[in-house]
Amino acid sequence: MRSNYIVIEGLEGAGKTTARNVVVETLEQLGIREMIFTREPGGTQLAEKLRSLVLDIKSVGDEVITEKAEVLMFYAARVQLVETVIKPALAKGTWVIGDRHDLSTQAYQGGGRGVDQTMLATLRDAVLGDFRPDLTLYLDVTPEVGLKRARARGELDRIEQESFDFFNRTRARYLELAAQDASIRTIDATQSLECVMADIRQTVTTWVKEQGA
């Protein structure tokens, strides 16, 4: 069966946009042309509104978004994107390149926020079932490096303004999950840009050839 859903994950400032460009270039060199791009949260009209609510520091004024409310908004945006965009594209044989997916919630909310892992797993199974990316590229970067890059881009969103401790917990959970799942490939994003790009090219090329896609 052809596998064609690739997701790019990582902390803020890990280089996901650059990685996406390298993935696209690599796939094109392998003769793959039909691709769409998604981001989470977002990617549909409803999901983009939810993105604004959950990430815009000013979206709800002084009201505090609770941890469970945050999780539910992320999943509402995700399931809308999966059901209305990603699954239909995959059914047509189109490749989908995603900026974040469920691993982000497991790492950020499960690791960073400390939300109960059993609750997250139950919710994920309820709304996504066995739907998973075929390949996830996790760009591993320390919070110190990643946030320095993110701050250089300009104003930070609500999540990006969290503490170093939050991002250290998030990174630790990412690494833990990556070690448990062979479909998640870890890329050392603290290397030079040239080395990171080379690692991504090699990883994607090898994986595609292994799939016979």
Curated annotation (Swiss-Prot):
EC id: 2.7.4.9
Keyword Lyase: no
Enzymatic reactions: dTMP + ATP = dTDP + ADP
PROSITE patterns found in the cross-reference section: THYMIDYLATE_KINASE
GO molecular function, one term: ATP binding
Alphabetical GO biological process terms: dTDP biosynthetic process; dTTP biosynthetic process; dUDP biosynthetic process
Record: residues binding ATP: G10, L11, E12, G13, A14, G15, K16, T17
Enzyme class: transferase
Swiss-Prot/TrEMBL keywords: ATP-binding, Kinase, Nucleotide biosynthesis, Nucleotide-binding, Transferase
GO cellular component annotations of the record: cytosol
Keyword Oxidoreductase on entry: no
Transmembrane segments: none
Gene3D superfamilies from the UniProt entry: P-loop containing nucleotide triphosphate hydrolases
Biological function: Phosphorylation of dTMP to form dTDP in both de novo and salvage pathways of dTTP synthesis.
Family: Belongs to the thymidylate kinase family.
Protein known as: Thymidylate kinase
